[in-house]
Amino acid sequence: MVTGLEMEDSMGIIREAYGVTKNEDRVTKYTMTNQNGMRVSIIDFGAVITNIWMPDKYGVLEDIALGFGSIEGYEVNKPAFGAIVGRVANRISNASFTLNGKTYQLEQNDETNCLHGGTKRFEKRMYKAECSMEEGA
């Protein structure tokens, strides 16, 4: 955990290398800073929020996000700390559901249940990020 960072007055987006996956995908970290000095870092592997720095009443930033310090931690550990969840969130009992009279059978990856969309979950995918500094973006 990073602690004791001084607030910056500048807003913007910083892009930097974060690591390489075991599939040899280059992972990029994007750190966004707002006008209040709050910072959020997101990587393009799993769209994971790796850091959230919030200023305290003295203006000192503290990282309040729970996560891992490297790409390897996000690849091999089961908790999806800060990652996008999908195709569904939580468990689907008996890995099946009925919608409009049709029953859909899903992959069982949590005993007899389907957890967070199966083994090809969104948290283990690479995403393509685009930076934008448009107002309200």
Task: For the regions a language model picked out, list residue spans one by one.
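Surface-exposed acidic/polar loop and edge beta-strand patches at domain peripheries
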Residues: 2-137
